[in-house]
């Protein structure tokens, strides 16, 4: 049976591993390195990947694509993409569908295409070692990747000629590698600060069971940001001394980036390093070449990136809160990602959790090792390992009044499936629009819309009668599909959220922060909408009953009900949920006599009820009103 490989598709470096017997093993590439730079370069006559691409980046900056993982599944309008445009020497353009693509040598490539080139390199590395063709893989992604980013990663695998059996979260993969041979029960935190993304996951491990309790993160925080702080500092110092802005020169900027990365790595073990870049520019007036010779201390580096390190601690606090555990209950902190080699990062993590992190895993390789273990589980080579991951954000749909009705809460174990019955909001409504949202706010408009679709040709019926079953399905890859079915006709419509849309990391951060800051306001707004929905529904049904059965009660009762209806109608114009609820109760009480008269009349017409007859049932039971969009004849054609 052909091997299933595990791939860590990283922002800065990528790594491939396989199961070798009972243990995972990292495979060296053709250059003899255990990790491969996630860089692709396009020259006049060839395409370079990995170290060869990195070596020529200075002389070919506009055609050398790096950190493309930060663009995968993103839109050109995303704030992160706008930020990236100013930082990278290559061109980021609109792919024609709103997605962020790259342009090199006049040709456009999607981030999935560029990522596929890196995956192909990983595939070839494994094939060279195994001596056989590889067609299946497990690929890792940041835990906080949204649906679009996961879809795009899967697409990249497909382009690379790989069947992606599973998309697995990076911290979860790291936990698998850490806990494979451990039999005791532990609660661990995986702190994963990589080249472009940050994740924190809290897991419980117990003799082969790996259960993720919560996850949080930032998909635009990583080593690339640390490098840019050094680059900006070096450029500013050079400008002060020579009056030349190196950031305007793409070749000089690429040299600075390489120097910054090298200095950052050196300062993890040394207290000072020298940055020496001869002939980096020239004096425009005299033509004299200018050189950069500068010392950078560890203390200076720490001051430049202090806020970035601190920014990683906020998601840590959120993850602990969501998991319902205290810092003291964390038995082990596992560090993952190259940036965790920085002494200051280790210090801050130690201070936050109150304990020294575990240093028994290689932060650059542990994610690929975990992916290989998951591949072994899927292939049947690894026994007695059960992995339970979670979805990072709540999912639901917009219902009447713009309310966000959750079907799946954040940190729900996946795979998962949840259904709920909704109905129409108008009489004879023949179509409903299902709008799918992701987020934590109570009102749909405050969350991120992932997609929408229409369920049409609903048979004419009074409002509240049709039963529309909406089903959310999240697979083990964290990819979402939504289905709506008219239970009366059996007609259904389905959508899998496509990679052309998705969330930015700022959107996710904003959703949770806003949800906490505005929880009370959201609650009040939701309470008002729900009160109005209840009031309008009661008003409609009572007036309809009065019209059809008003002759079954005396005139004073009819008058009392009409007065209560008018009072409720007036209260619905207000923004006071208490007033509306009071009017609802008054009308309910007033209409009680009418209800009794209707049932008595029905009972006398039907005669004595037999034991096997069903009692009266309301079609409104457990039904939530759904918002809809009038499609119009032309739109539906």
Curated annotation (Swiss-Prot):
Residues found modified as Phosphothreonine: 197
Domain of life: Bacteria
Gene3D superfamilies in UniProt: 1.20.1270.10, 3.30.420.40, Actin, Chain A, domain 4 (3.90.640.10), Substrate Binding Domain Of DNAk, Chain A, domain 1 (2.60.34.10)
GO molecular function, one term: ATP-dependent protein folding chaperone
Pfam families cross-referenced by the UniProt entry: HSP70 (PF00012)
Biased composition range(s): Acidic residues: 621-631
Residues covered by region (Disordered): 531-552, 602-637
Induction: By stress conditions e.g. heat shock.
Keyword annotations from UniProtKB, A to Z: ATP-binding, Chaperone, Nucleotide-binding, Phosphoprotein, Stress response
Family membership: Belongs to the heat shock protein 70 family.
Entry function: Acts as a chaperone.
UniProt-recorded name of the protein: Chaperone protein DnaK
Annotated organism of origin: Rhodobacter capsulatus
Higher taxonomy: Bacteria, Pseudomonadati, Pseudomonadota, Alphaproteobacteria, Rhodobacterales
